């Protein structure tokens, strides 16, 4: 299995002057109560360990976390089973779980981005993009979208600033719902500090999508997964509109994705 080493592995670098971070970090404190709540969540540990004992944690019937990933021997790696419901949380096993790290089939994002990714100049998008040097199977984990974790107030300020100054926008807002009710919003900005995930462009017909992945913290990681088989040299893209792709279209900047179903506009990043 490609990701079977139980160590975090990420030796990518930025082509420009941005601080490389391996996973999301808190924004600088602004002293607000909103920041304090975010910091409290960031510093909390999820006490939801599974009680499996040396089993594979594959089976949703027996493992309280399992069931989202599957190991297909022909692909030689864990892949995400269900592609339809991206808002569904994915919970990985962690150090508190009863299972063995070596045999657990519910640990993927925690080992870091896949290898053979490459930052390049995308002529289509006239800026940086991310592509793969080798084939990627459907459902495979690409990388986290890691950056500074923002409060809603700080995110609104940064969005306004990006808009006013005509800067590229890296702020990503992930809403999670349960029974159609919004449960949690996670906002990540890799503009100043981030990982390789910041280079994926938007497409109206993307080959990747974002899922919320929890490991040992109530704040999810934004995991980028392959939405289909992806060929070597293909640029990796996801839909910036997130869970509701019909919203916020026809409002943003002109879209350069060139997909047959392109709406002509990039979705605006909005915070409800
Ligand atoms: C998260 S960054 C993606 C990486 C970026 N291209 C770079 O050079 O660092 C998002 C920015 O890339 C550009 N971009 C991404 N997708 C685009 C699209 N479909 N059409 C036009 N510009 C896009 C926009 O400037 C957007 O604000
Ligand atoms: Zn388990
Ligand atoms: Zn496990
Ligand atoms: Zn488009």
Pin down the residues of each PLM region:
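Catalytic cores of histone-lysine modification enzymes
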Residues: 73-77, 85-96, 100, 107-214
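Short beta-strand element of the conserved SAM-dependent methyltransferase core
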Residues: 52, 130-132, 223-225
């Amino acid at each position: 299995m490609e990701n079977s080493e139980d160590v975090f592995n990420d030796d990518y670098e930025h082509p420009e002057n941005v601080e490389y971070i391996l996973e999301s970090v808190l924004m600088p404190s602004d002293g607000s109560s909103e920041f304090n709540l975010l910091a409290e969540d960031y510093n909390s540990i999820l006490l939801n360990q599974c009680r499996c004992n040396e089993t594979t944690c594959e089976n949703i019937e027996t493992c309280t976390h399992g069931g989202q990933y599957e190991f297909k021997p022909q692909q030689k790696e864990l892949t995400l089973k269900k592609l339809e419901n991206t808002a569904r949380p994915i919970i990985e096993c962690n150090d508190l779980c009863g299972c063995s790290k070596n045999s657990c089939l519910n640990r993927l994002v925690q080992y870091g981005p896949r290898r053979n990714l490459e930052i390049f100049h995308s002529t289509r998008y006239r800026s940086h993009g991310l592509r793969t040097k080798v084939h990627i199977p459907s459902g495979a984990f690409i990388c986290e979208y890691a950056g500074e974790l923002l409060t809603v107030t700080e995110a609104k300020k940064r969005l306004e600033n990006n808009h006013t100054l005509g800067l590229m926008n890296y702020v990503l807002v992930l809403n999670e719902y349960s029974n159609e009710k919004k449960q949690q919003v996670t906002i990540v900005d890799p503009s100043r500090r981030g990982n390789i995930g910041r280079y994926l462009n938007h497409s109206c017909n993307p080959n990747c999508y974002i899922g919320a992945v929890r490991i040992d913290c109530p704040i999810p990681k934004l995991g980028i997964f392959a939405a289909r088989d992806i060929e070597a040299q293909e640029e990796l893209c996801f839909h910036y509109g997130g869970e509701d792709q019909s919203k916020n279209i026809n409002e943003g900047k002109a879209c350069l994705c060139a997909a047959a179903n392109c709406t002509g506009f990039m979705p605006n990043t909005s915070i409800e």
